[in-house]
Design a protein with these regions (language model features):
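Short catalytic micro-motifs in class I SAM-dependent methyltransferases
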Residues: 116-120
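Class I (Rossmann-like) S-adenosyl-L-methionine-dependent methyltransferase catalytic domain
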Residues: 1-107, 121-133, 137, 143-209
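A conserved beta-strand element that flanks and buttresses the S-adenosyl-L-methionine
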Residues: 113
Length: 209
């Protein structure tokens, strides 16, 4: 799927379905918030949420006083939904409408968070581009939290084939330079009552060589 069709697909999803009509909806993103706390993020930490879309993680981060939050998503429609929900608080957030595989970071971050974005990348070139951006955007010693469908999770989502991971296969995809420091499973219940099995893995970015 090329960049244009990928964007078209996600814009259609976010303009034709309500916020709580998508399978990944969470009223409160508890696993992500817990892991962000575990890596020692402080209020001044630079945090980027990759594929954040209309997720409520940004609401929680702003509400908890985090001062340097960025949300990146391919779909401008998804970002507009989050901005509308936040109202004036949206001005406290930096918003980037871009495909992460083509994005060129202009700064570095203390924490990279991705819940259910990278698993939509199934081509090796897209995965390599993702890792390249990850390496460019996370400072040495920074943290990376990635949640994906587990090996026994769904094979498709929103009509698209996904890549499923466990901690070992995700670590292999990221390659050297990222130390696995935590992994856990999570069962997400969709708005329609279906259970989806996820894995969340946390990595620390090693020093530049």
């Amino acid at each position: 799927m090329n960049d244009f069709s990928r964007q078209d697909h996600w814009d259609k999803v976010y303009t034709t379905r309500g916020e709580n009509q998508v399978s990944w909806f969470q009223e409160t993103p508890a696993p992500s918030l817990e892991l962000i706390g575990h890596v020692g993020a402080i209020r001044s930490s630079a945090i980027i949420d990759i594929g954040g879309g209309a997720s409520r993680l940004v609401d929680c981060l702003v509400g908890q006083g985090y001062e340097d939050v960025t949300v990146l998503d391919l779909s401008a429609a998804a970002l507009a939904s989050a901005q509308s929900r936040l109202g004036d608080k949206a001005n406290r957030v930096k918003w980037i409408a871009a495909d992460v595989t083509a994005w060129e970071p202009t700064r570095v971050y203390d924490l990279w968070h991705d819940r259910a974005a990278v698993h939509f990348l199934t081509e090796s070139a897209d995965k390599a581009a993702y890792v390249s951006r990850l390496k460019a955007a996370v400072k040495p010693g920074g943290s990376v939290i990635i949640g994906t469908f587990a090996p026994d999770g769904p094979e498709r989502c929103s009509g698209l084939i996904v890549s499923r991971y466990d901690a070992a296969s995700l670590a292999a995809t990221l390659g050297c330079g990222f130390e696995l420091i935590d992994t856990r499973r999570h069962e997400h219940t969709t708005p329609s009552g279906v259970t989806q099995r996820f894995q969340f893995s946390t990595f620390r970015r090693g020093p530049d060589r």
